[in-house]
Amino acid sequence: MAKNYYDITLALAGICQSARLVQQLAHQGHCDADALHVSLNSIIDMNPSSTLAVFGGSEANLRVGLETLLGVLNASSCQGLNAELTRYTLSLMVLERKLSSAKGALDTLGNRINGLQRQLEHFDLQSETLMSAMAAIYVDVISPLGPRIQVTGSPAVLQSPQVQAKVRATLLAGIRAAVLWHQVGGGRLQLMFSRNRLTTQAKQILAHLTPEL
């Protein structure tokens, strides 16, 4: 069966968007609020009608992820910030495979996310309550699968409990995107052998988004 590179690219952009947001949070203590909302909201939607629906039904919601994906795919340098993004992206893919192969882990994750949906009736998605709840899911369900993702940034920024919770919640969104990526036919070999195909697809999607003013 021919692979749907549109869906694969969207899901991959979802992983990369989380990686970029984690990087922004770790270095600056804040990140693109709209992109964060899209990524966190993707955790909640357990029964989406399409790949795009996971990210709010609009390609523009993945602009940060698509731009990051192009940077990761075409990185001529394995140093600095691009290296961080590549490391976060690949680490999320590795953890997703461990999650999918760990007995009962996906069921546990699903049950915990159902709990988030109940909390959303009383609290905003980006409230400290929801951030802490999502961070706790990451710590309880994902972290024990190992290896842990080493987040690098400003030590002063990373000491903040609020930033730590946001980083973990955003990593959980990255795991969600990685699960989706695998479901639509994604695989790590594509990063080596289908790089041009993924690059072309990402550029095509970005080309018909309205430019940011």
From Swiss-Prot:
Main localization category: cytoplasm
GO cellular component, one term: plasma membrane
Protein name, as recorded: High frequency lysogenization protein HflD homolog
Pfam family, one: DUF489
Taxonomic placement: Bacteria, Pseudomonadati, Pseudomonadota, Gammaproteobacteria, Enterobacterales
Keywords: Cell inner membrane, Cell membrane, Coiled coil, Cytoplasm, Membrane
Gene that specifies this protein: hflD
Family: Belongs to the HflD family.
Subcellular location: Cytoplasm; Cell inner membrane
SUPFAM superfamilies to which the protein is assigned, alphabetical: YcfC-like
